[in-house]
Swiss-Prot record:
This is Retrotransposon-like protein 1. Pfam families: DUF4939 (PF16297), RT_RNaseH_2 (PF17919). Keywords: Developmental protein, Membrane, Transmembrane, Transmembrane helix. The gene is RTL1. Rtl1 is one of at least 11 genes called Mar or Mart related to long terminal repeat retrotransposons. They do not correspond to functional retrotransposons, but rather to neofunctionalized retrotransposons genes. RTL1 is an imprinted gene located in a cluster of imprinted genes on chromosome 14. It is expressed from the paternal chromosome and has an antisense transcript with full complementarity to RTL1, RTL1as, expressed from the maternal chromosome, which acts as a repressor for RTL1. Excessive RTL1 expression and decreased RTL1 expression are relevant to upd(14)pat-like and upd(14)mat-like phenotypes, respectively.
Length: 1358
């Protein structure tokens, strides 16, 4: 019987889709590699091949290397070799990708999809911001203060990109080393098996299964290294590997041969290209593991998205799959609101929507701390139901479904139920059924096209038994199913399965043969079938709007079915008895001017020009007009003399626009008239437009239908009453629609247009603006950040002529007074003008009035953009008293730019009662006034409000809090606010930001990870606003210090101690690349040279820390003579001189004692040659560590270029039962002297070994001395080198050499210091060790580094 199934949630939903079962994404695993043949150019990655190889690489430095290396997170450090690979279109990269330059060389030749995606990401993020800047440029006026130059901005961005590139390269290098470590582990296992069997196993044919790649490659490399004379060039080595390929891998290789690819003659590049196609790399494995377990948890959405986007480039999954995984890890609070808006059509849009919801929720939590009467009206607008919701089941994949009685294996499968959208379902894998099935109800809900079978078929299990009683009659066409980047077409049989929407049977498992992790419940696809057929980009969904035909030019496609709302001809056909023959407006030649005048007026003054026959004209219009003028005059008097603190019209008016990103402005046809007496007052117009003061209406009198109707204003408000103030603003002929996301905005615009069509209200298409991010409305420029005055208002104010009478002055004051909140210290500046207007004396215009008039116009010219206050962010309050007026400024910090953002200004004259206040009360008065005016933002804030005081006022507090000076009747009022005081920063030509701003910005920067700012810029498209408030100026030294601190904090967040023991920080990128890659490549290729043999031994030898060590194996040789022993003095460890570095080196090296008569180079063969250890008789002895001959050390001296001419009689003969000690003389010199017996006793008591064994006298007879090497052995010594040789320096750089300081800390030495210490040590050994190797007398120019032939190896080991 078929197991019950689960629900699914729809992730690619179009606007007209029905609701569907939806479910969370499940655990699963896939891959990103494709196996498609092709050719390319050779990459740089590969093992070192000598100086000639190094010369081919471009010059490298820290900066240049970072530009050359691919810097995608978790991506390989090496440039990929050319490989026949068909690139996949990756989704847009993360924010860090946008900061980097695309890789050059072979990376460009291959057309890297990551770079292309990055370019597309840049265009997507730059174009909206550029358009917004262009629109804002028309309303920007000149501002004083220092602005950042483009050079400074470019330099900052370049340094940030350089820092990000370094971080990503280090992480990429770490994961690439894990791949090499895995190959090394496989090589060790193969060597152990070969030693036990006596020979290396023959490599099996590789068919392309990625699970067998490591074993195949390592075995081929070991075999090739065992026969260097047979495979002496790269073409033969490549041919050997191709001869052991089959299936898909052979097809890939044949494609290279047919295209005559240069990879055939380059073995390292061939291996790298093969690795790109067939290797399941550690970076991909870790990224998939992280993607399956990533959850938001208690973090912010920004941090969660940062981590999510860091995994996107390396995974390369389709966009719809990434959307499903991103939604899966979100907190339930964000998901609750996310699924109430239409589904975004891309991952970038979804990220923007999530960030907006998080910000809106933070603002909501801050507003809920206010009393109910102080909360904004639109607080619950996000809770409004949406017609299309994301139907998501209530249980997560990690939880237990109530209808499932046991654990199952599920895959997150994106099923494309039709060509237009996909649905995410949890597909059951371990059902036991033989075929693939889909739930009948699920197919009906998603309108899946079904077909009838010619005859019914029973449902069978894997053993052939029948499941259920009803046969299968229906089936689907092949549907595209995507699991991460594994896509295929599956035909489903339709069965009733209420709990499981999709079931994958045994036939599916047989075809794909996935690797199943039953503990974690995941599947990974490695089979050749999947590499060949499944790992390719899925076909894109068909966008319906792309095929829509717009009936009117300029009308967006989503509204093409509503063209009759804009089409004049259709409007005439429906509303006029005499339609126009040419489809134009049925207007006379004299009417357009009147219509244009009505359209240009924000206040709809055409009401009083209407014919007297208008049915809605009020009675006694002239009397009401006179009353209106008299009331306006006295209202102006009251406003100018008012001394009370009330909530401001601005910014309260624009609270409902917080979070709005998209705007559409519709221009209504006809004439909109206002019946209200006070309808012409500016602030009343604003209240009506924003829905704050609406008339109570249950119906309206129908207006005459015509192409140019006359409609009362209250009728338009009645039509839009349930939308006004929530996502619509309307006054006169302008209707502004605003939304938080683009998908939601499409739905809101359609709602308005449908409502207008129903009420026969028509719009002008030529004057309408669709889908903008900056729009002008009622004299304001509205942006997602805030609001400012538009160009028309600024032109009227700044171009107003000098008043010549009180009437002219009153008109000027009456016009500018509603916009007073855009000017800092408005009451102080306009005080002479107001005094002149309110005086009973004859009008007089003097110098003081002229200066105030000009100063007021300059203040409006410099009026900044007022940002939307964010209650969830900290506030700064700047207040003061000047003369007879007080002023206050509400300030916050812009999250994106880190600069000062003005939210509101307030000023008023001091009342006669307040003049009698004491000096302390007068200083606190503006603070109290600001708290009263902005109480809806400042009351019960989570973080303290920072009150900025000047040095004099701050000193007057005497280190006491402000509450100490509060009068008794103000204490209760101030108890509602969380505030603190700080010194006001100095203002030298501009407004410097408070010092705490940098702390706040750094704290936010660290909390939201290093990429927060870049993420917001890339996702939201916000530009760096060049028109911030005038006079802004940054302290250059403070900015440089902050930048350095940010870099240090960013580097501190990298776990350097977990990445190669923190030594990467001391080297450049080129050195890291050369040391690590070449070093490990040398280990994997098993070069038969003595130097690399010594390095291999040093890496693999470990000290035995047990109390009773197991006996070691030793080669049996004749009894030796006396040899050298080295015992370390304790002062060598406790000292801090350069020589102490030798101790750290020797703790990783075997003891310097006599061992056996095997020559030094044969000793290397002993450790390298597989299966040759059994040729020597071994017996156990007491554990002393690994034994080496003096010849071994002499060979090491020769390799490092340390040579000393021995002098006769210079070195005394060693006496029996004596030891040699290593001592420090002065600060740099090292000498050997004979150890005294009491010294040895002291060493044994202290337990000083450090890896060098001090043996007792009774065991000295077991030592052996090295015999002269056989003259018949044809040996080739390594080429002598100098200690400053680059390869020697690389060797020293790969070893961690430290000095113990007095406090016990380790300090890393430089390579030059280590080379100097090593030179002294090897010189010492060279003088003491005898005999000289036989090959030392040979001409030095004939010695070179090369592989030993087979016959030489056999001769040395016989």
């Amino acid at each position: 019987m078929i197991e019950p199934s689960e629900d699914s949630f729809e992730t690619m939903m179009e606007h007209k889709n029905p609701s569907s079962k939806q479910m969370e994404s499940s655990e699963g695993s896939s891959n990103t590699t494709e196996a498609t043949s092709g050719s390319g150019v050779r990459g740089e990655a590969g093992p070192a091949s000598g100086p000639a190889q190094e010369k081919k690489e471009p010059p490298s430095g820290p900066l240049q290397e970072m530009e050359e290396l691919p810097t995608d997170l978790l991506q390989d450090m090496e440039e990929p070799s050319s490989g026949p690979r068909k690139e996949i279109e990756d989704p847009p990269n993360d924010l860090l990708q946008d900061l980097e330059e695309s890789c050059n060389g072979s990376h460009q030749a291959r057309g890297d999809p990551l770079s292309g995606a990055s370019d597309r990401m840049k265009e997507a993020s730059v174009n909206p911001s550029g358009a917004r800047e262009e629109q804002e440029a028309h309303t920007d006026l000149k501002e004083s203060g220092r602005e950042e130059t483009p050079q400074e901005q470019n330099q900052t961005e370049h340094s940030t990109a350089e820092l990000m590139a370094m971080v990503r390269s280090i992480i990429s290098l770490y994961f690439r080393m894990q791949d090499l470590k895995e190959q090394q582990r496989v090589a060790e296992e193969i060597l152990i098996k070969g030693i036990n069997a006596g020979q290396l196993p023959a490599p099996k044919h590789f068919s392309g299964d990625r699970r067998e790649f490591h074993e195949f490659i390592v075995l081929c490399q070991l075999t090739l290294q065992s026969y260097p004379r047979m495979f002496y060039n790269d073409r033969l080595r490549v041919g050997y590997v191709i001869n052991h390929l089959s299936g898909l891998a052979l097809e890939w290789a044949k494609a290279l041969l047919q295209e005559n690819s240069p990879l055939i003659g380059d073995f390292p590049a061939f291996l790298e290209a093969m690795s790109e196609v067939f290797e399941y790399r550690q970076a991909l494995r870790v990224a998939e593991e992280a993607m399956f377990t990533i959850r938001q948890g208690g973090r912010s959405a920004t941090e969660y998205i940062d981590e999510f986007q860091s995994l996107v480039p390396i995974l390369g999954w389709p966009d719809e799959v990434l959307q499903a995984h991103l939604c899966q890890g979100l907190n339930e609070e964000i998901r609750h609101y996310l699924f109430r808006v239409p589904q975004p059509d891309s991952l970038d849009s979804l990220i923007v929507l999530i960030l907006q919801i998080e910000e809106k929720l933070a603002e909501r939590r801050a507003m809920l701390r206010l009393p109910p009467e102080a909360r904004p009206r639109n607080l619950t607008w996000i809770d409004s139901p949406a017609p299309e919701r994301w139907m998501v089941s209530s249980w997560l994949p990690s939880e237990v479904h109530p209808d499932i009685n046991r654990a199952h294996l599920f895959l997150l499968l994106m099923v494309r139920v039709n060509p237009y959208h996909s649905v995410a379902v949890q597909a059951l894998v371990d059902s036991g059924a033989d075929g693939n099935f889909m739930d009948e109800k699920f197919a009906q809900e998603h309108y899946v096209e079904l077909y009838e079978k010619p005859y019914p078929q029973p449902v069978q299990s894997v053993d052939g038994s029948l499941i259920g009683n009803e046969p299968v009659w229906l089936y689907t066409e092949p549907l595209v199913c995507i699991h991460q980047n594994h896509q295929e077409s599956i035909e489903f049989d339709i069965v009733p399965s209420p709990n499981f929407s999709v079931v994958l049977g045994i036939r599916w498992l047989r075809v794909h043969a996935p690797e199943v992790d039953w503990i974690k419940g995941r599947c990974t696809f490695h089979s050749p079938y999947c590499l060949k057929n499944c790992f390719r980009p899925p076909p894109p969904c068909i966008a319906l709007e792309r095929h829509g035909m717009s009936l009117l030019p300029g009308l967006p496609h989503p509204y093409s079915d509503l063209a009759d709302v804009f089409n004049p001809k259709e409007a005439d056909d429906e509303t006029s008895d005499q339609p126009s023959s040419d489809g134009s407006d049925d207007l006379s030649e004299s009417e357009p001017s009147e219509l244009q005048q009505a359209g240009d007026s924000d206040h709809s003054e055409t009401f009083y020009e209407c014919p007297s026959t208008a049915p809605w004209e009020p009675v006694g219009a002239r009397m009401q007009e006179r009353a209106r003028l008299q009331e306006e005059y006295w209202d102006l008097q009251d406003m100018l003399t008012n001394r009370q603190d009330y909530i401001q019209m601005i910014p309260e008016l624009f609270d409902q626009l917080h979070g709005a990103e998209w705007f559409t402005k519709l221009e209504l046809r006809g004439t909109i008239v206002e019946e209200s007496v006070n309808g012409h007052r500016t602030e009343d117009v604003w209240k009506a437009a924003f829905g704050l003061e609406l008339e109570e209406m249950k119906s309206y009198q129908p207006f005459a239908l015509s192409p140019d109707p006359i409609i009362p204003q209250n009728v338009i408000h009645f039509i839009l009453k349930d939308m006004l103030g929530f996502f619509v603003l309307s006054y006169g002929q302008e209707v502004l629609i605003y939304s938080m996301s683009q998908e939601e905005h499409l739905h809101h615009v359609r709602q308005v247009l449908v409502r207008f069509r129903h009420h026969n209200v028509y719009c002008s298409l030529d004057k309408s603006q669709f889908h903008r991010q900056t729009v002008e409305f009622l004299g304001f420029v509205v942006t997602p950040k805030g609001v400012k005055l538009n160009k028309n208002v600024m032109t009227i104010i700044t171009g107003y002529p000098t008043p010549g009478s009180k009437l002219s002055l009153r008109n000027f004051i009456e016009f500018v007074f509603p916009y007073r909140h855009f000017v800092e210290r408005f009451s102080i500046i306009a005080e002479p003008l107001v005094r002149q207007l309110l005086s009973s004396y004859q009008f007089y215009w003097g110098v003081e009035e002229q200066e105030a008039f000009e100063c007021l116009k300059r203040a409006f010219r410099k009026a900044p953009l007022l940002h939307h206050p964010k209650p969830q962010n900290p506030f700064y309050l700047e207040t003061g008293v000047t003369g007879t007026a007080l002023h206050a400024s509400l300030i916050q910090i812009d999250d994106q730019t880190g600069k000062r953002a003005c939210c509101a200004f307030y000023s008023r004259n001091i009342s006669p009662i307040e003049v009698e206040y004491s000096q302390a009360e007068m200083k606190i008065l503006p603070i109290r006034a600001a708290f009263m005016v902005w109480c809806r933002y400042l009351e019960n804030t989570e973080e303290p409000i920072m009150i900025l005081l000047n040095t004099e006022d701050l000193a007057s507090l005497n280190n006491d809090r402000l509450t100490v000076l509060l009068p008794g009747h103000w204490v209760f009022f101030f108890s509602h606010f969380n505030f603190d005081v700080m010194e006001l920063p100095e203002q030298d030509g501009g407004r410097a930001l408070p010092p705490v701003r940098n702390l706040r910005w750094r704290r936010a920067f660290q909390r939201n990870t290093a990429a927060r700012q870049t993420l917001l810029l890339a996702s939201r498209g916000f530009p760096r606003d060049p028109s911030t408030e005038s006079g802004e100026e940054e302290n250059e030294e403070q900015d440089e210090l902050n930048e350095q601190i940010l870099r240090q904090e960013l580097l501190a967040m990298i776990p350097i101690d977990q990445i190669l023991n923190s030594f990467l920080a001391h080297f450049s990128m080129a050195q890291i690349r050369a040391v690590i890659l070449h070093f490990f490549r040398g280990l994997l290729y098993w070069k038969n040279t003595l130097a690399l043999a010594a390095i291999l031994v040093l890496l693999r030898v470990r000290q035995c820390l047990s109390l009773r060590p197991a006996p070691a194996m030793r080669v049996a040789r004749p009894q030796p003579q006396r040899s050298l022993r080295l015992i370390l003095d304790s002062s060598l460890i406790a000292g801090s001189s350069i020589t102490t570095a030798i101790t750290q080196l020797l703790t990783q090296m075997p003891a310097l004692v006599g061992a056996n008569t095997i020559p030094a180079q044969e000793l290397a063969e002993l450790f390298l040659g597989p299966g040759r250890w059994q040729r020597n008789a071994l017996h156990s002895q007491a554990h002393r560590g690994l034994q080496f001959t003096p010849g071994f050390w002499l060979t090491l001296c020769e390799f490092f270029g340390v040579r000393v001419t021995p002098q006769e009689g210079h070195l005394p003969a060693l006496r029996q039962n004596r030891y040699l000690e290593l001592h420090v003389v002065g600060d740099e010199d090292v000498v050997l002297r004979e150890a005294l017996q009491d010294d040895l006793q002291r060493y044994r008591q202290c337990g000083l070994h450090d890896g060098l064994q001090d043996t007792s006298q009774d065991k000295q007879d077991n030592d052996v001395q090295e015999a002269p090497p056989s003259h018949t052995a044809a040996t080739h010594p390594p080429r002598p080198r100098h200690l400053m040789d680059p390869q020697v320096l690389e060797f020293l750089g790969s070893r961690l050499l430290h000095i113990h300081s007095a406090d016990g800390q380790l300090h890393l030495l430089s390579r030059e210091q280590a080379a100097r210490a090593l030179s002294q040590f090897l010189t010492l050994i060279y003088r003491r060790a005898l005999p000289i190797p036989a090959w030392e007398s040979q001409p030095r120019e004939q010695a070179r580094l090369e592989e030993l032939p087979d016959e030489d190896e056999d001769a040395n080991l016989d």
